A protein has these predicted regions:
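Glycine-rich nucleotide cofactor-binding entry segment
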Residues: 395-445
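Glycine-rich phosphate-binding loop of nucleotide-binding enzymes
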Residues: 61, 68, 76-83, 170, ...
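Extended, folded cores of ATP/NTP-driven motor/assembly subunits in large transport
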Residues: 1-416
Length: 474
C-alpha cells in the first residue's frame, strides 16, 4: 500500500479489498444485476469486454389491413432483411408496450385557452379528445426496436463496423418503407429506465456531466429501487410484479397474426426475439449429418424387418417423416435463398398485483395455445430472462429454436401505421381503425397537405368537415 496515504484512506482501501474478496459473482445490488459495462454518448454500449451493441428504433407500417399482394411483398422484403445478418451479428427485436405518462399525454392533446369567448367550447372539445384517448390505447405506448451486436477486441475496432452495419440496416428499413432512427446513449438509457420503472412515475433525469460531478455510474440513473427474485416463477421490480416466459414453438404451421396478437394485449409487457444466424456451410453440414443418421436408422429398421420376416418397406412413421422434413430443409437452404436462424422468443408480463400478473400471463398463454404453441415460465431463470429482455442484444437464456428465414419472418413486426404528431396546430381526425389510437396531425407538415373526404350517404362527411373547421378555429 502506498506510504503517502493517511489512515482513513488506508482503511477505505482495505474495506474495498475485503468486499472484493467476498465477491462470489452474485449481484449484490440492483445496479450489479444490469448486464452491461459502459454506455457511450454516441449510442454504442460495451456489454462485455469484447461485445458491443447499438439500437435502432423503427416505426410501424400498414400490414394487417393491406391487400394480399402487398402483404406478400412486405413479407418477401422482410425475408431479405433477415438474410442480411450473417453469423457474426447477433440481433434482437424488442416490442415494448409501456404505460404512458397520462398527464403529459393529455397535455399534448389539450387545446390551450385564448382571450376570447370560446374557451368553454375548447374545454368541451378537449374533454372529448380525452375520452377518445381513454378508449383507444388504454394508456400504452407501443414502440419497436432492433438491437445488434458484434464481437470486437476494442472500441476502436467495433465502432466503424457497427456504423457500417447501422447504415446498411437503415437502408434496408427504407426499402421496406419504414421510418427508422438510431438511438444515442442517453435515449438508450431512457429506454431502460422506462423498463425498470414500469410501476411508478419516476422521471428520467440524466446528463453526461452528472457522471463527472457525482462520481455515479449510468446504472445509478436507470436502476429500480430493488429487484426481488424470491420465487422461481415471478419477481418484483420496484412496485410492480413480473414474470418471464418463453415461447415453445411447436406448431407445424405458423400464422403471421401470432406476434400481432401478443402485441394487441392491453397490458404493460415486453416481447423479445433474440435471433442468431447460423453459418450457412455449418448449417448444411449439420443437416446432411442428420440425414445420414436417419438413413442409417432406416437401414437398421429394414434389416430388423427382414430378420423378423415382414415387409422391409414398413418402417416407423416418425423415421419417414423426419427424413422427409430433413431433405426438404436441405433443399430450402441449398436452392431457395433460405438461411438457418436460432431464435429465442421471450415474453415479460407485468401486473400491479400478483393476481393481475397471473391474469395477464394466462391471457398470453391462451394466445400461444390458439396458435398451437406453448408459453412456458422460465423456472429459476427469471433474472436471466428479465436481463435478456433489455435492448442489449445479449441472450442469457439457452433455450433456442432453429427456424429458416421464412419461418422466422412469419413473426412480421408490423401491424398498422400510426399518425400522431405533437405540436400547436395538430388537429383531431378520428381513431385508427385497427389500433383505436388517436389520429392527430398537422396536415401542413405532411408531404401532401390536401384532403378528400369520402363516404356513403349519411356516413358523416359533412360532420367530419365541420369538426375539422371547428378544431382549426379553436
Amino acid at each position: 500500500m502506498p506510504a503517502n496515504l493517511n489512515r482513513k484512506q488506508q482503511r477505505e482501501i482495505k474495506a474495498v479489498v475485503e468486499r472484493a474478496k467476498k465477491d462470489n459473482g452474485i449481484p449484490q445490488t440492483a445496479q450489479q444485476s444490469i448486464p452491461f459495462q459502459r454506455m457511450f454518448p454516441d449510442g454504442i454500449c460495451r456489454v462485455t469486454d469484447s461485445y458491443y451493441t447499438k439500437t435502432i428504433q423503427f416505426q410501424d407500417i400498414n400490414y394487417q389491413l393491406a391487400q394480399q399482394e402487398d402483404k406478400t411483398a412486405i413479407f418477401d422484403e422482410w425475408c431479405s432483411f433477415l438474410n442480411f445478418f450473417d453469423s457474426s451479428i447477433h440481433f434482437e427485436l424488442s416490442f415494448m408496450n409501456l404505460s404512458t405518462d397520462a398527464e403529459s399525454f393529455e397535455k399534448s392533446i389539450r387545446i390551450p385557452f385564448k382571450k376570447d369567448s370560446f374557451n368553454p367550447v375548447r374545454a368541451e372539445y378537449s374533454q372529448m379528445l380525452k375520452k377518445q384517448l381513454a378508449q383507444g390505447n388504454n394508456g400504452l405506448t407501443k414502440t419497436k426496436y432492433l438491437t445488434f451486436g458484434i464481437e470486437a477486441e476494442s472500441m476502436r475496432q467495433a465502432k466503424p463496423r457497427l456504423n457500417h452495419i447501422e447504415n446498411d440496416l437503415l437502408n434496408n428499413f427504407r426499402r421496406l418503407g419504414v421510418i427508422a432512427t438510431t438511438m444515442n446513449g442517453k435515449e438508450r438509457l431512457h429506454l431502460m429506465h422506462s423498463m425498470f420503472h414500469m410501476g411508478d412515475n419516476d422521471k428520467f433525469f440524466f446528463d453526461w456531466k452528472y457522471l463527472v460531478e457525482s462520481g455515479l455510474s449510468v446504472k445509478d440513473f436507470i436502476a429500480p429501487t430493488a429487484f426481488a427474485f424470491k420465487t422461481n416463477r415471478t419477481f418484483q421490480m420496484g412496485s410492480i410484479f413480473g414474470s418471464m416466459s418463453y415461447l415453445a414453438i411447436t406448431a407445424s404451421d405458423l400464422s403471421d397474426r401470432m406476434l400481432a396478437d401478443f402485441l394487441d394485449m392491453e397490458s404493460t409487457q415486453i416481447v423479445t426475439m433474440h435471433i442468431q444466424s447460423v453459418d450457412q456451410t455449418a448449417a448444411i453440414k449439420t443437416i446432411k449429418r442428420t440425414i445420414t443418421e436417419l438413413d442409417r436408422s432406416k437401414i437398421e429398421e429394414q434389416k430388423k424387418a427382414v430378420r423378423s420376416g415382414y415387409d422391409m418397406d414398413i418402417i416407423p412413421s416418425d423415421l419417414a417423416t423426419y427424413g422427409k422434413d430433413a431433405k426438404s430443409l436441405l433443399k430450402e437452404l441449398q436452392s431457395q435463398n433460405e438461411r438457418m436462424f436460432m431464435v429465442t422468443f421471450l415474453v415479460l408480463n407485468t401486473g400491479r398485483t400478483e393476481q393481475e400478473l397471473e391474469n395477464n400471463v394466462f391471457q398470453a398463454q391462451s394466445i400461444a395455445q390458439k396458435h398451437n404453441c406453448n408459453l412456458r415460465r422460465l423456472d429459476f431463470q427469471q433474472e436471466s430472462g428479465l436481463m435478456s429482455s433489455l435492448p442489449l442484444a445479449q441472450n442469457l437464456i439457452e433455450i433456442r429454436r432453429g427456424l429458416t428465414t421464412s419461418s422466422t419472418a412469419i413473426f412480421v413486426p408490423f401491424t398498422t401505421q400510426e399518425l400522431f404528431q405533437n405540436g400547436g396546430e395538430t388537429l383531431y381526425y378520428g381513431l385508427n381503425a385497427l389500433s383505436n389510437n388517436l389520429i392527430m396531425v398537422d396536415r401542413k407538415k405532411l408531404k401532401n397537405p390536401n384532403g378528400l373526404i369520402l363516404g356513403t350517404p349519411g356516413s358523416g362527411k359533412s360532420f367530419s368537415a365541420k369538426r375539422e373547421i371547428t378544431n382549426a378555429f379553436l
